[in-house]
């Protein structure tokens, strides 16, 4: 039987840890067993404890001190060390064959865009440990206030989709922060990215450098031509919002198919 997990990705500050905590809270409410696997060697304490924590193997602070490296260099060193010691990860995961695992990943996108660290870990999980994985990429909703930032984030999401080679869900997080700043009609154009949004924004700025206008047009057209990037709205404090996103993840990972069928009751009580 395949194991099931979700990789939580996105830039720093996108709300990944909050999203992980919300999933755990929802699953506990409905009686599902789930655990957070922390893959960020610089992670801070969260509401729910990490069941598996890369910092038990190696931590960013220790590497920076002992190897005299900066934060980014130390992060890469930590993941290269993890790749050389995947037997540690195998042993830790080995105790959780039937539980749902939530992999909380670092926010540095170079771990999958510049060096194949996360893609290698994903391949190990899917091929060696028999995981059905879904990737969720979080982009914070305030980015929609600046169309250029939004399309930059959408391009990063598309990069993750292509390089990780996993079924993928993009999530527009922290939606509650922009409710008073954008109407539903315009928000829908961001959930299904409309290339014209970027052109409309740049068109209002007559002082824009023509080279930037052409670059923005190419970026917007690239996202539009691929047709891969769409977003689901997320409010982490809204149980219905969490349940909706989790239903998409469950459908992709085929979670329900791996559950044992329950025998029906022999006798049904009927109220008189």
Swiss-Prot record:
Query: Which residues bear the site annotation Stabilizes the phosphate intermediate?
Result: 72
- Gene3D superfamilies attached to this UniProt entry: P-loop containing nucleotide triphosphate hydrolases
The protein's matches in Pfam families, at most eight in alphabetical order, are given as: ATP_bind_1
What EC number(s) does the entry state? 3.6.5.-
Oligomer status and interactors: Heterodimers with NPA3/GPN1 or GPN2. Binds to RNA polymerase II (RNAPII).
Functional summary from the UniProt entry? Small GTPase required for proper nuclear localization of RNA polymerase II and III (RNAPII and RNAPIII). May act at an RNAP assembly step prior to nuclear import. Promotes sister chromatid separation during anaphase.
The protein's name is GPN-loop GTPase 3
Task: Provide the organism lineage as a comma list.
Answer: Eukaryota, Fungi, Dikarya, Ascomycota, Saccharomycotina
What is the name of the gene encoding this protein? Answer: GPN3
């Amino acid at each position: 039987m395949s194991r099931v997990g979700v990789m939580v990705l996105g830039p720093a500050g996108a709300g990944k840890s909050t999203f992980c905590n919300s999933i755990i809270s929802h699953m506990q409410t409905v009686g599902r067993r789930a655990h957070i696997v922390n893959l960020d060697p610089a992670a801070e304490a969260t509401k729910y404890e990490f069941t598996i924590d890369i910092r038990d193997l190696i931590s960013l602070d220790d590497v920076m001190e002992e190897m005299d490296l900066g934060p980014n260099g130390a992060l890469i060193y930590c993941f290269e060390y993890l790749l050389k010691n995947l037997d540690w990860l195998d042993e830790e995961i080995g105790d959780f064959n039937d539980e749902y695992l939530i992999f909380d990943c670092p926010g540095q996108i170079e771990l999958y865009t510049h060096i194949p660290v996360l893609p290698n870990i994903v391949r190990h999980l899917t091929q060696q440990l028999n995981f059905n994985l879904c990737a969720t990429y979080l982009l914070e909703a305030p980015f929609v206030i600046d169309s250029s930032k939004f399309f930059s984030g959408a391009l990063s999401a598309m990069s993750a989709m292509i390089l990780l080679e996993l079924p993928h869900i993009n999530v527009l997080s922290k939606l509650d922060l922009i409710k008073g700043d954008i109407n539903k009609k315009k928000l829908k154009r961001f959930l299904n990215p409309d290339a014209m949004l970027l052109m409309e924004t740049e068109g209002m700025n007559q002082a824009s450098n023509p080279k930037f206008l052409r670059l923005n047009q190419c970026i917007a057209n690239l996202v539009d031509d691929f047709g891969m990037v769409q977003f689901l709205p997320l409010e982490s404090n809204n149980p219905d919002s969490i349940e909706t996103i989790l239903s998409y993840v469950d459908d992709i990972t085929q979670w329900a198919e791996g559950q044992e069928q329950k025998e029906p009751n022999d006798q049904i009580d009927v109220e008189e």
